[in-house]
């Protein structure tokens, strides 16, 4: 609401703050003021009864565009203020025009000076006359010395009709250095204009190159010619790269084959073929039994010698079910004894001891028996068999203490497991150890 009130107040006071039409030309303001004067004249005539003039009215109502009235022409009813304003405007425009003309003249003078300076610089670079003009401020003795140096330095220095000029460096009004330079004509380049100019290929032609080589030593010429014309380095590089590639391939192939051999050895080492015959013949070798009691063996006493094995009839082949049951019991007791004595390792395998490339191999945990020592079998029963007798089997009485020595090299007698289910006949001179069934 407060903003609306402020806006209304500004609208009321706006005509007082409006700026007069000072930016418009004087003749346009005079034409704008003419209708107001005409209206006031008509009102006065109506009141007095006289007829106003129609000249200005007709000129305004026709709406024709013509030339602007001149500043000298005065309206029919001019005022002193309009005449003074018109004079001031004319003075201002004249002053502005003069300023513009002066600035343009200054810019043209500066441009001409720059152009002259550029021409002088070019003349100093490429013109002998300009060089002489530049040295005109020097002493005559110095000028003569420069001319002598120029003749001495520029003689046979530039080729192919090139323009030669010297750059003289003064120190304490004395000539300290003279540097000749050549301005080459079209088609030549170089410090002495001795090379053909080839666009986008900045290399000397073969003839000039050979001429330049003549100034070198013999060894340098040979090296430059060999490096520019021979392809031996490129072929040598290709051969070296080929040898390196073949070496890398052979090394990788050997490494892969070695890894496969290690894996095969590890698999065979972890699961040897002899491990599957451990129950029948441990380690696949014959086991000699030093102390084997006879079938009619009784509990020995100290100082007595056990009798030999009797082959009397009365023993028979064990039945299939009894053999299988005895085999399972013997297997459990046999492995428990070996594991308790530290011969067979535990089933758990430490992953830290296994190589990394073996962890991904499927593992078969089969423990092979490699035992050389004494095994103490307590409560081991024996049974002798004979093919001719079909009576009930006679069980050997269990000895108080039986020691079996397992050796690797001897192969006197055969230790046969009661796992035979095919009904093979046993030897009458041997007794098979049996685990007592409870």
Swiss-Prot record:
The chain crosses the membrane at residues 231-253. GO terms for cellular component: extracellular space; membrane; plasma membrane. Keywords: Disulfide bond, EGF-like domain, Glycoprotein, Growth factor, Membrane, Signal, Transmembrane, Transmembrane helix. It is found in: Membrane. InterPro entries: EGF-like_dom (IPR000742). SUPFAM superfamilies: EGF/Laminin. One of its GO terms (biological process) is epidermal growth factor receptor signaling pathway. Residues 69-85 have a biased composition (Low complexity). Residues 35-94, 410-438 are annotated as: Disordered. Disruption phenotype: RNAi-mediated knockdown in combination with double mutants for the class A and B synMuv genes lin-36;lin-15A, lin-8;lin-15B, lin-15AB, lin-35;lin-8, lin-8;lin-36, lin-8;lin-9, lin-8;lin-37 or dpl-1;lin-15A results in suppression of the synthetic multivulva phenotype. Disulfide bonds join 154-164, 158-182, 184-193. Residues 36-62, 411-428 have a biased composition (Polar residues). Residues 150-194 form the EGF-like domain. Residues 254-438 are cytoplasmic. Residues 1-13 form the signal peptide. Residues 14-230 are extracellular. Glycans are attached at residue 161. GO terms for molecular function: growth factor activity; receptor ligand activity. Its main location: membrane. Probable ligand for tyrosine kinase receptor let-23. Essential for vulval induction, where it acts downstream of the synthetic multivulva (synMuv) class genes. Probably by activating let-23, phospholipase plc-3 and inositol 1,4,5-trisphosphate receptor itr-1 signaling cascade, plays a role in ovulation by promoting gonadal sheath cell contractions and spermatheca dilatation during ovulation. This is Protein lin-3. It comes from Caenorhabditis elegans. The lineage of its organism: Eukaryota, Metazoa, Ecdysozoa, Nematoda, Chromadorea.
């Amino acid at each position: 609401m407060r903003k609306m009130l402020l806006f209304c107040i500004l609208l009321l006071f706006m005509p007082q703050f409006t700026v007069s039409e000072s930016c418009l030309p004087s003749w346009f303001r005079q034409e704008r003021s003419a209708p107001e004067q005409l209206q006031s004249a008509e009102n006065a005539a109506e009141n007095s009864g006289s007829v106003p003039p129609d000249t200005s009215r007709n000129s305004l109502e026709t709406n024709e565009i013509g030339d602007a009235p001149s500043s000298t022409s005065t309206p029919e009813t001019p005022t002193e203020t309009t005449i003074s304003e018109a004079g001031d405007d004319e003075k201002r425009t004249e002053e502005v025009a003069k300023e513009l003309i002066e600035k343009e003249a200054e810019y043209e003078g500066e441009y001409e000076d720059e152009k002259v300076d550029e021409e002088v610089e070019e003349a100093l670079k490429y013109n002998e006359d300009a060089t002489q003009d530049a040295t005109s401020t020097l002493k005559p003795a110095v000028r003569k010395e420069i001319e002598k140096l120029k003749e001495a330095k520029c003689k046979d220095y530039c080729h192919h009709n090139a323009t030669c000029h010297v750059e003289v460096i003064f120190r304490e009004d004395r000539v300290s250095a003279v540097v000749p330079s050549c301005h080459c004509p079209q088609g030549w380049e170089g410090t002495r204009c001795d090379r053909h100019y080839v666009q986008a290929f900045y290399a000397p032609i073969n003839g000039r190159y050979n001429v330049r080589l003549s100034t070198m030593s013999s060894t340098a010429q040979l090296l430059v010619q060999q490096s520019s014309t021979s392809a031996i380095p490129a072929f040598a590089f290709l051969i070296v790269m080929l040898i390196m590639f073949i070496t890398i391939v052979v090394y990788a192939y050997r490494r892969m084959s070695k890894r496969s051999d290690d894996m095969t050895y590890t698999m065979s080492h972890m699961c040897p073929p002899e491990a599957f015959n451990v129950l029948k013949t441990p380690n696949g070798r014959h086991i000699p039994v030093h102390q084997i009691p006879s079938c009619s063996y009784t509990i020995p006493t100290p100082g007595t010698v056990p009798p030999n094995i009797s082959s009397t009839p009365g023993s028979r082949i064990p039945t299939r079910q009894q053999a299988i049951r005895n085999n399972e019991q013997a297997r459990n007791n046999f492995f428990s004894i070996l594991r308790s004595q530290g011969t067979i390792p535990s089933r758990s395998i430490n992953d830290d001891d296994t190589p990394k490339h073996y962890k991904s191999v499927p593992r078969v945990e089969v423990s092979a028996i490699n035992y050389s020592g004494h095994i103490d079998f307590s409560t081991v029963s024996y049974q002798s068999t004979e093919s001719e007798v079909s009576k009930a089997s006679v069980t050997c009485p269990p000895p108080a203490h039986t020691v079996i020595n397992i050796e690797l090299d001897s192969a006197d007698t055969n230790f046969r497991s009661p796992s035979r289910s095919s009904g093979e006949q046993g030897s009458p001179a041997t007794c098979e150890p049996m685990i007592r069934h409870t």
